[in-house]
């Protein structure tokens, strides 16, 4: 019996299950391709934006960063930096003291990061749902196929292949199709989740660097380093006092 003949023997419920799984598979592939395109664009534009941002951190002009932000709107790093830079520039343009706007800038960075993460995670919930439910939908079709096979045996009083082939085909195809739909969705979900974690780290780093640069926050020293420096200073003062005597 060919595969086409097996499909032809599938019952109404089994056919509905397979159609549902096929539609889920098509939607899943569409979501995966869309997320891959967006993530690749975000990564590429972020790599292009980082040299401009790095130049600003080393003493470059703020206006260069603002102009570059317009060219890299799909970059997750640029989106977060844009919120902080525009907030800071708005305070400066209004004639207020920029040094007093650190809370406004950090709040804008935090809100922008949250919004960017929501955008990056869009569609992942659907992939997770498909990955977790598709095998169970296939299992439902399997159970229905086995039931149909037993009903055929009961109706004919025999258990030949021609009697149970429809039910067995329905059971096996539903199981295979459910697993086939679930595997790409789960793999893609895990892959994109890892990408988002990396993007989150990059956005956090850029936010910290921006705040430190705008407000000239000194690097925090470890307590043991501060103690050593204080002791060295005391020793130097003592030596100078002895020398003066």
Annotated model-derived regions:
Residues 8, 12, 18, 122-125, ...:
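Internal alpha-helical transmembrane segments of multi-pass membrane proteins, especially GPCRs
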Residues 44-137, 148-160, 187-245:
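Predominantly long cytosolic amphipathic alpha-helical stalk/bundle segments
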Residues 157-171:
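Hydrophobic alpha-helical transmembrane segments and adjacent short intramembrane/lumenal linkers
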Residues 22-42, 139, 146, 181-196:
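Alpha-helical transmembrane segments
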Residues 171-185:
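Hydrophobic alpha-helical transmembrane segments of polytopic membrane proteins
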Residues 1-53:
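Hydrophobic membrane-targeting segments
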